[in-house]
Amino acid sequence: EMWVSKRDLTNDEKLPGATLAIKDMDGNTVTTWVSTDEPHRVTGLHFGESYTLTEIRAADGYALADNITFRLIQKSDEDGNHLEECEVYYLTTKNILFWKWDDWKLLDDATVIMQDDITKVQISKKDLTTNEELPGAELIITDEKGSEIDRWISTDAPHYMERLPAGKYTLTEVTAPDGYAIAERMEFEVLPNGEVQTFEMFDDTIKVKISKVDITTNEELPGAELVIKDKDGTEIDRWISTNGPHYVEKMPAGDYTLTEITAPNGYKVAESIDFTVLPTGEMQ
């Protein structure tokens, strides 16, 4: 008999919930089981033959481990008589076709130890124009069933998570930082490996276009003094119109009033206009 112990790579503790299989060199499955918090006893393997320990499904939040090739050598007593006990050796090279005897290393206690690394996910919320980390966005991650997995406010560093089960997820921006438009939902997939998997969501700035036009020609009208105030009466921007539209960037979503202070010579002052900047960057 021999033993298989499934462990956490980060702390070497026993790891339940992984589906494992032992296959012979022809690829035939000899036995399968789900790991528990105790080593698994394996019997019925043949002395002298090589086998492969394969992880079919990792425990939630863990990466799939590499295959381990091993063989059983029957023990003998001092007189050369075979015993019903065995020694277990594992192959240190990944080339199972070409190896030397020195490539086989003896395992302690006839136990094959397979370790799983944890999954690592990094979420970056970035400014579309600068590609820099963007603080102040409220974000949530949901799984395929719509269950909330994590919620946080972005900072000037990526958001890091460990032990996220492999699978498909949706990243949603609940609220954008002031002056930015809410990004579209983003689907992503976490793979069962131990690498840091990075996903990025970009926010564009809100750009408000203000045109002062002649009502008869619909052409841009220079020379008007205009001001935008928020719902509290705080002045947001003031300018003199030109031959082109005026743009205001990073304007927080909310309600505003556009007022003409002075009209160009020969024109009457227009009535104030109330408008709303939506979180999507659109105007109403």
Where does each model-flagged region fall?
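Solvent-exposed loop/turn and edge beta-strand elements of beta-rich ligand-binding domains
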Residues: 1-284
